[in-house]
Amino acid sequence: MRDKDLHEKGLEMGGKIYGKDGYKGLVERVQKYDDELADYLVENAFGQVLTREGLDLKTRMLCNVAALTALGIETLLRSYINGALNVGATEAEIREVLIQMHLYAGWPRCLNAFSVFEQLLEDRGK
């Protein structure tokens, strides 16, 4: 069952991270699988977890970049690096997160993450 307040909060947060069109596309992709799953994504991940107190949004996004690098999930990694840049993370901060990950995730995942990052920067025109 949809929680309207959390849903609105989640939509607002997703728009802040990915831009309204980018976030709308994410939600629509998940809705293809299941409407309730899309609501859960919006309300839980974006409406509850990413809006908690204790860490600012940029720091949360950098934590997500680190986790996705360690897990080797490159498709989501690109999206989260882009989101981190959108909420104020610098290229230097992202590079340092990726470098830090070689200690815990290994060289192959670190280098794969750098490839994702470099391609994203190229696509963003940098």
Language-model regions, residue ranges each:
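Acidic, glycine/proline-rich low-complexity segments that act as flexible tails and inter-domain linkers
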Residues: 1-57, 110-126
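Short acidic alpha-helix initiation/capping motifs at coil-to-helix transition points
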Residues: 39-42, 71-77
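Structural motif
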Residues: 53-58, 88-92
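Short helix-coil transition sites and intra-membrane helix breaks within transmembrane domains
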Residues: 55, 71-75, 106-108
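Short, structured motif recognition centered on aromatic/hydrophobic residues
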Residues: 60-68, 98
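Extended intrinsically disordered, low-complexity coil regions enriched in Ser, Thr, Gly, Ala
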Residues: 74-92, 111-115
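Preference for long, well-ordered alpha-helical segments
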Residues: 93-117
